[in-house]
Amino acid sequence: MKAVCVMTGTAGVKGVVKFTQETDNGPVHVHAEFSGLKAGKHGFHVHEFGDTTNGCTSAGAHFNPTKQEHGAPEDSIRHVGDLGNVVAGADGNAVYNATDKLISLNGSHSIIGRTMVIHENEDDLGRGGHELSKVTGNAGGRLACGVIGLAAE
């Protein structure tokens, strides 16, 4: 099964995210490419709603059906939608590749119809000591977003 998300946002930030899941309960490979970012790390999350009527703000909170605290992708305690950070170079471009065991393209952890968001700041992965660390990773504003949809095989 495959899915895709075309992300657009403020100040020329844009990207495309592709998801591939070989088996129903298998891990999901995530490949993303971005342009227009400031150099450095940017939080990257699946948010709960597929609603972008008010830009990225109407996408809701991180996708968290298991009601956990925010964490890193490799943590046992994390939101399903916590995918860590995208790292942009000095040219503003970034490539992200990861395989994740919590997100899915089907079932109760399905990300289909939800919104991908890239944030202005680094996600502290729940370890920053800020009041928002265990909620959002203190990643700041939402730079670009898009709704995840099924892709043609």
Swiss-Prot record:
InterPro entries found in the cross-reference section: SOD-like_Cu/Zn_dom_sf, SOD_Cu/Zn_/chaperone, SOD_Cu/Zn_BS, SOD_Cu_Zn_dom
Annotated compartments: Cytoplasm
Catalytic activity line of the entry: 2 superoxide + 2 H(+) = H2O2 + O2
Annotated Cu cation binding sites: 45, 47, 62, 119
Function: Destroys radicals which are normally produced within the cells and which are toxic to biological systems.
Cofactor binding notes: Binds 1 copper ion per subunit. Binds 1 zinc ion per subunit.
Binding-site positions, Zn(2+): 62, 70, 79, 82
Quaternary organization: Homodimer.
Name of the protein in its database record: Superoxide dismutase [Cu-Zn]
EC numbers for this chain: 1.15.1.1
